[in-house]
Structure formats: structure tokens, C-alpha cells
Amino acid sequence: MRRFARVALLFLGCGVCSLLYGVSQLALSLEQEAGGARQRQARESAAPGGGRQAGSADGGEEGAGRCKNLSVSFWNSYWMLPSDVCGVNCFWEAAFRYTYMETQPSETMHLAVVACGERLEETITMLRSAIIFSIKPLHFHIFAEDQLHESFKDILDDFPYEGKVNYTLYPITFPSEGAKEWKKLFKPCASQRLFLPLILKDVDSLLYVDTDILFLRPVDDIWSFLRKFDSTQIAAMAPEHEEPRIGWYNRFARHPYYGVTGINSGVMLMNMTRIRRKYFKNDMTSVRLRWAEILMPLLKKYKLNITWGDQDLLNIMFFHNPESLYVFPCQWNYRPDHCIYGSNCKEAEEEGIFILHGNRGVYHDDKQPTFRAVYEAIKNYSFGDDLVRSLLQPLELELQKTVHTYCGRVYEVFIKQLKKSIKDLSVRRSKGS
């Protein structure tokens, strides 16, 4: 019995000693923190501006960079972060917890397009449609073959919106590994879009569109979806089909795809900062891979099974990472498939088409005259002319000639939003904004 009592006393003594040691260390850390705070305050009061932002800890650039770096190698065990890492209380907190880690859409809207071959006129028409109704400044990132650069420059320099619109021309470039395969994937240069997060390293958010896109409402409105992303979402696209019975992926695909009918990448809104940071789940390795690491392995594994090139690769990625995709309604990427088999985009029927996507070359043949009429109307519109007399009224007359087609039977959806956009623009101009 005495032996047990001695053991109990020994444990009790050890416990008391541990408690005293913990209290002394806590008191010491509080004293050091108070002293450090006084020293920092003295330094900051002597510096211009006097204050500092969260994340600019005393560790200088190294400390600030360490605080913002998402690699787990920067954080010690149990997420107990050293006091010199962050300019906030990081105790028991993870790197993702603080708002300064979140990126906010910038005031300027960034729009990217890739143009190869005979796509100059189509691209210019798309850019014109983006300019007509948009409110915030636009910066166009145009990736084009070298022989197209001079033509783009001559046309864009004549646009009458100096100050509101800027542009940058880029050559078509692919990674040295597999450059030939990337260039010929699906259509010439189409896969360039996959490398935009790696090329435009200083651009936080970006709207990528195909050349055959027409904006029927301000770019600002689709840009605002960035603020609707939850903490896991990195991109937004529309479904490939609304009706599974006419879907391509669910009937013919030989690879994984997102959701029920897949996604269409002709209109792709991206938070590129998040894309560059994310580690993607995949079916090639148990290790998650970053964007730059996953593209080539995906192509090597699936190149014999994909039909639509880079769009198929994006479907595979988001099949494994569905939580990272925001899906917007079909009216933001309205294609011939939404009307040639009968109207199957309810949102467009109710509110009109927001973004028209004339894939399959429908702007340049007579197979879908409804789509071609919208394209020709915007192409022929002169900046500064009255939008009702020079754009809307001629377009409505042309659309009425297409009622013999399935899409022409619902031609009202092609001008419903356009009418509203013109009215809203007129109100803004009357208010001087």
C-alpha cells in the first residue's frame, strides 16, 4: 500500500512541476510579446505611414512570403505557427483561414482569346460586342499567330474607347515537352487556353472565350460570378447539354466527364490565383498534382480517347474535382444545340440569351441563319451610332426572316436581353456614368 502511495505522490509531484513550468513559460512569452510589440510600435511610428498590413511580419519579405505560401512544408506540426510568420494570431490556425489569402476580382476585367487561322474578323467582332455594353475597363489578352499581330494592332488602335480598353498581343506558345501534340490537339492553337494560368502569372482572374462568342450584355455581369465562388471553386463553365437525350458526353465519351452531360469550355471564367495554387485529385497517381504538373500526364493517358481536345481534359479534371467548379446557366453559353432540336434552355426563354456561342461555324454559313443574323448585325454596327436604329431594328427584321428554322421560331430569345442591355446603356449615358 505504501508503495502505491509513493507512486501516486511521485506522479502528483511531476504534475505540479509541469504546471509550474507551463505557467512560467506563458508568463515569459507574454513579456516577450509585450516587449516586441513596443519595439514594433516604436519602429512603425518612426516609419512613413506608421502602420503595417496583416502579413507583413517582422521577418521581412521572407516572413511575409512564408505566411502566404500554401506549401505545408512552411508550417510546423499541429498548425501551431511561429509568431514571426504571420502578422496575425496564427495559433492553431491554418494558412487558408485569413481573408488576405483570398483574392478579390480587380477593377479591370481581363478577357482572353486565342486566334489562329482565319479567325481575325470573328475575334474582332467578339471584342466589339464586349466593348459595346461593358461598364468597367477591359483588358484584352489576345493570343494569335504572328502573321495576325499587325492586323489586330491596326484595327484595335482605331477603336474609339481610349482609356476604357487596353490590349496585349501574345505569340502562340506551348511547353517544350509535347509542343507538337498540344498545337494540333482538336483545332489549331485551341489548347493554348490550358496554359493561360501559367503564362499570365500576374493576372488574378480571367474570362476566357472562344472567338465565336458574342456578348449581349455587359461583361461585368459574368465577371460578377467571381464573387459568388465559394472557397473551393476555381472556375465557372456552363453544361455541354441541358437535355441528356441529345448529350454527347453521356452517350459517346470514352473518358470521365463532369456531371450528367459534361461542361463546355467556350466560356470559362477563372480565378487563376486559385488555379495556380490548387493541388488536383486525379486518376494517375495518389499524389495530388498542381496545374502545371497535371496537363501533360493527362494528355498522355487520354489522347487516344478524347474527341474535343482541351475541353475533354477539363472535363476529366473536374470529374475528379467537382467541388472546384461553379456551373452557370445555359444562357451564358447559348449554342445551336439549345434550339436546333427544339428549345431546351429554359433560362434563355425566360430572360433571353446573355452570351451567344456560334460554334460549328454557324456565323459563316446558312445552316443557322438566326445565329448568323446576330453576328452580322454586331459586325456591321459602327461605334457611336444609335443602338436601336443601327443595331436592334435591323437585327429584328433579319430574325423575322428565320422563323422557318427551329432556332428562328424562338428568335425573341435572341433579342430579349439585347433590348434590355440597350435600355440600360441609355439610362447610364443619360446619367453621365
Swiss-Prot record:
Residues exposed to the Lumenal side: 30-433
Residue intervals annotated with topology Cytoplasmic: 1-6
Region named Disordered: 39-64
Keyword Transmembrane helix: yes
Gene Ontology, cellular component aspect: membrane
Glycan-modified residues: 69, 166, 271, 305, 380
Gene Ontology process terms (BP): O-glycan processing
Keyword terms of this UniProt record: Glycoprotein, Glycosyltransferase, Membrane, Signal-anchor, Transferase, Transmembrane, Transmembrane helix
GO molecular function: UDP-D-xylose:beta-D-glucoside alpha-1,3-D-xylosyltransferase activity; UDP-xylosyltransferase activity
EC number, as in UniProt: 2.4.2.42
Subcellular location: Membrane
Catalytic reaction(s) noted: 3-O-(beta-D-glucosyl)-L-seryl-[EGF-like domain protein] + UDP-alpha-D-xylose = 3-O-[alpha-D-xylosyl-(1->3)-beta-D-glucosyl]-L-seryl-[EGF-like domain protein] + UDP + H(+)
Membrane topology: Single-pass type II membrane protein
UniProt keyword Transmembrane, yes or no: yes
Transmembrane segments: 7-29
Primary localisation category: membrane
Purpose of the protein: Glycosyltransferase which elongates the O-linked glucose attached to EGF-like repeats in the extracellular domain of Notch proteins by catalyzing the addition of xylose.
UniProt family annotation: Belongs to the glycosyltransferase 8 family.
UniProt protein name: Glucoside xylosyltransferase 1
